[in-house]
Amino acid sequence: MVGPGPTASAAAEERWQKLQEYLAAKGKLKDPNAKPYLKAKNICPKPPPSKYTPGPKKDVSNHVLPSKTTRPINIKFQTKPASITASQKPESKPPKLPSRGLTSRCFSSNTDCKQSSKPQQQPRAVSFTAGLSRNPRQCPDIQELKTKQQQQAHGGNAKCTHPETNTHAAKQPVDGFPDETNKENLPQALPKPEKPDPELHSIRKPNTGSSNQTQKGLAPKQILSKSSVTQTALKDRANKQFIRNTQIRTQAVKSRPRPTVADSTRPREKPPQTAPSHSVPAHNKTQTSKKPMTKNTQDITVNRVRYGKPNETKIESCPATEQKVKHTKPSSQLNVLQGGHNSRHPNMRQDQKPVQPHLGPQTSCVLQKSRAISQRPNLTARNFNSVIPSTPNMRANKTLNNKYNNIFQQKAQTLDSKFRKFPPQSHFLNKTAPRTQASTAAASRKGAPSATQTHPHGKKPEGEDRRKQLEEWQKSKGKTYKRPPMKFKTKRKVIEEMNTSFWKSIEREEEEKKAQLELSKKIDSTLTECLRLIEEGVLPNEIFTIVSSIPEAEKFAKFWVCKAKLLASKGTFDAIGLYEEAIQNGATPVQELQEVLNVLQDPCRSTEAVTSDTSAAGTNTTSAEELAKEESEQPCPSLTEMEPIAAAAPRIPVSEWDNHGIKLQVAPIPRICGMPEVQDMKLITPVRRSARIERTVARYPEMLQEHDVVVASLNELLEVDKTECFIFRENEALPVTLGFEVLES
């Protein structure tokens, strides 16, 4: 096998080097790739297949490769230059937006080429040209410059043919692709058979690393930041040599005759000789079943009728099969990620009838359309992905390609996906309407208010504020409550009533006291008049009737005095029983009654003394003095026995004993260390006791009764207690000395 001439190769390399220097001077040079063998995969995305009329599937794998017995297909790989790596093999599907220069360079040279190319070399050339023309980042000016230089290079290289191209009898020329380029602007859209030739499987092994290049192609901004002139020149030089070989093979296809049905069945009989057995992947059947579709079915029909070539399906199927075998693995990685596009192409697995190429007038059309294509704005990786088709068989390979898909998905994420992956703390606001970074930036430039601006005060109003707002709203609407609000005046009324009743009760008590005082004065005056009448000698029955008719007269001591005198005038009477009855009725003052009873019981006393006593009973002072004199004159055996006590006890003034509530409380002296003689003495303290309590104290429990001894007078004290010495203790609450000397300390 003889390769292309050294002169053409050197000229192509020189032109390519000049182009790279020009791009470097303009600052538009592509960044170098650390893995140049992935460049072809990075440049060549897969276009979506065209819509077509579904037809019966045909197995054309038996008659697509003619004259396979003479020379094997793998011979051309033995003479491949060493600088061309395995990953530079063309892709299975051309890109959505190919470059104008490279596309025109490929097709413009077809007019001078001979149809003697090897059938397996034609799809390689076309697909690689599509792969090189995939780069969307080149500006239109650079692409036009490339187009001119590449057209010149094809002019010199078109005459050189590879000896290997004579092995097959007939192949379809490369000019069959312009019809497809008119619709999708793609240099390649050929159908492929349902079952590819097993001899062609050995070519796709080196494409395993090409997925990394496609991943890097999806992030063009990251690639552009790492530019190097030296590595790019070496990479492009290798690609240039490969393009030159593919162009020569493509031109040589025209001169070959069409194979017959008998010849097309030969390629299955002989396996490839030079391809290693380990280079064929295990999943080749699933991936090779994917077929690129033609875009325009009308062009297919017109070209078939125009040129009248019935065996077009057999001629076209072989290049499509070889091309698809080479690029099945990288294309499956792209199509697995974009399985959503399968709905657009439901008939993708059915065979298409290719268009018979026409070498003459279509070349200029391709050049013009390729220039128009190159002037379109550059697309991002997302736009390429949106047009890449996928089939169910491609999705079936997802489990076999997990390693490549994981790497591709990680690097294929754009800035928007990273933003969505790591949302801010307020991501719950954007769940219903997620925004990308671009839309957020655009909204901020337009002045759209953010969530924090629209709600600067996130605090809710308090209950009082809400109640006021509700009241204002109800007033504005004219609404009222169905029932009046609760009033608290009832409680205030109760308090006022309690206060008024308290003061009223006090007033009532005062009035009652005044009325009682007036009544007591009237009763007292009436009883005094009765006593006067008794002394005058009025009939006792009439006086008794008058005294009994007075209400509440039993509470006065004068009533009992009148009664006692009336009984005494009649004869003897029970003075003690009368006294007890007076005490039970609460007669006051009791001392006045005692004095009268004592006078009435004295047999030695004359009637005059009695009358004088009764006449002087009006004044308490005179009667008390007389009683004291009488008591002192009367002999008392107890006084003689207790002379020291009587001598020590002073005479109590009568004025201090007028208050009958004052009594003497006898209590033992607390124990004092070092003074044993004091323990025999007792303390006498004047206290005030109520007559009402004394009357009811017998009904009280033991705890409420008087614990100490309480006597009404000194005589009772001598009778109750036999202590020889008493000590008087002054009561601060009751400043009464009772005639005792108070030692000032």
Swiss-Prot record:
Expressing tissues: Highly expressed in regions of active neurogenesis and neural stem/progenitor cells (NSPCs), both embryonic and adult, not detected in lung, liver, kidney, heart, and skeletal muscle.
Post-translational modification: Ubiquitinated by the anaphase promoting complex/cyclosome (APC/C).
Keywords: Cytoplasm, Cytoskeleton, Isopeptide bond, Phosphoprotein, Ubl conjugation
Bias-annotated ranges (Basic and acidic residues): 192-202, 459-475
Positions bearing Phosphoserine: 745
Domains as described in the record: The KEN box is required for the association with the APC/C-Cdh1 complex, ubiquitination and degradation.
Name of the protein: Cytoskeleton-associated protein 2-like
Name of encoding gene: Ckap2l
